[in-house]
Regions:
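Short, basic, helix/turn surface patches
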Residues: 18, 32-40, 100-109, 144-155
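An accessory alpha-helical subdomain
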Residues: 120-187
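Short, hinge-like loop/turn segments at secondary-structure boundaries
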Residues: 20-26, 68-70, 91-94, 136-139
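Conserved beta-strand segments of alpha/beta enzyme cores
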Residues: 2-4, 50, 72, 117-119
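NAD(P)+-binding Rossmann beta1-loop-alpha1 motif at the extreme N-terminus of oxidoreductases
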Residues: 1-21
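Short gly/ser/thr-rich secondary-structure transition/capping motifs
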Residues: 6-11, 55, 73-76
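Rossmann-fold dinucleotide-binding core
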Residues: 57-118, 125
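Rossmann-fold NAD(P) dinucleotide-binding segment
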Residues: 16-65
């Protein structure tokens, strides 16, 4: 597959140069930027291209893309972080109403060509499940630190595996906090 990327600033000239001949256009932008980007992007699509996103929530961006674009729309959510194990490369595919099996298959094929496994879901089921999983992740992380803060006598007994869990929790609560704040608000 031929890949062309666009970065900021996203100008009409950049869209006009990059999009002719594209079979699919993937928006790798914050879901909150969708409303700002779509009016500039959609006039450069001819209705046959697949418009897809890569975002952590699905209902809002999928709805925005479908309202802005009459062609096929497919939402995607890679369910892994920046340093995944090969077995962790799963991607949720959320087809829009105008997407046929051919459109969905092309998007799934792109991810499979990169070593990912895919599964399909509705946007509603995705967002409900993602909110539950991320909520549990966030709450359990808070529980670790709240418990240890009140029971320092436990610290000498922490195992290496629990220390790794604490480090992941610390990262989630400090470095990833803005992302989780946005996810909670979007769900």
């Amino acid at each position: 597959h031929t890949v062309a990327g666009l970065d900021l600033p996203l100008t009409d000239e950049a869209f006009a140069e990059a999009l002719p001949g594209a079979d699919a256009v993937f928006l790798c932008i914050p879901a909150g930027a969708m409303a700002e980007v779509l009016p500039h992007l959609v006039p450069h699509l001819d209705g046959r291209q697949i418009l897809a996103d890569i975002t952590s929530v699905k209902m809002q961006p999928l709805g925005q893309m479908e309202r802005a674009y009459a062609g096929p729309v497919v939402g995607t959510h890679p369910l892994f972080g920046p340093k995944p194990q090969p077995s962790d490369l799963r991607v949720c595919i959320t087809p829009g109403a105008a997407a046929t099996d051919t459109h969905i298959g092309l998007v799934e094929g792109l991810f499979k060509d990169m070593g990912c496994s895919t599964f399909r879901s509705t946007a509603e089921a995705h967002d409900s499940a993602a909110a539950s999983i991320q909520g549990l992740n966030f709450i359990s992380s808070l529980a670790y630190f709240a418990t240890l803060a009140e029971h320092e006598e436990l610290l000498p007994f922490i195992t290496p595996s629990f220390r790794r869990r604490l480090e992941a929790s610390r990262k989630l609560l400090t470095e990833d906090a803005p992302l989780f704040e946005w996810l909670f608000e979007a769900n």
